[in-house]
Amino acid sequence: MHQRCFGLRASLSIFKAFAVTLAASVFLQVVYFLSLLFMSFRPTRESDRSIHSGTRQADQPQKRDRDKTEQSNVPKLDPRRKRRTP
């Protein structure tokens, strides 16, 4: 009698573990899908942001100046020495 009861408990715990694993998997897939869905609506590039934020073409020279400044701040590799130049 005890063996039958133990077998039922074991199969019930295996079923519970399977159900919990399946529920967690479905939950993670739903969260991942929703994150992809919401990320597709967010602008990713600077040009996309300017379209969505309503900025005009007059703001473009500032962006170009900022890009030049950012590029000049990047240390460059000296091809002969393989080190960064100051």
UniProtKB/Swiss-Prot annotation:
Main location: membrane
Segments of skewed composition (Basic and acidic residues): 61-70
Pathway: Glycan metabolism; exopolysaccharide biosynthesis
UniProt KW Membrane keyword: yes
Stretches the record annotates as Disordered: 44-86
GO biological process: polysaccharide biosynthetic process
GO CC terms of this entry: plasma membrane
Membrane-spanning residues: 18-38
Membrane topology designation: Single-pass membrane protein
Subcellular location: Cell membrane
The UniProt record lists the keyword Cell membrane: yes
SS bond list: none
Keywords: Cell membrane, Exopolysaccharide synthesis, Membrane, Nodulation, Plasmid, Transmembrane, Transmembrane helix
Signal peptide: none
Function: Inhibition of exopolysaccharide synthesis (EPS) and nodulation ability (NOD).
Protein name: Exopolysaccharide production repressor protein
Classification of source organism: Bacteria, Pseudomonadati, Pseudomonadota, Alphaproteobacteria, Hyphomicrobiales
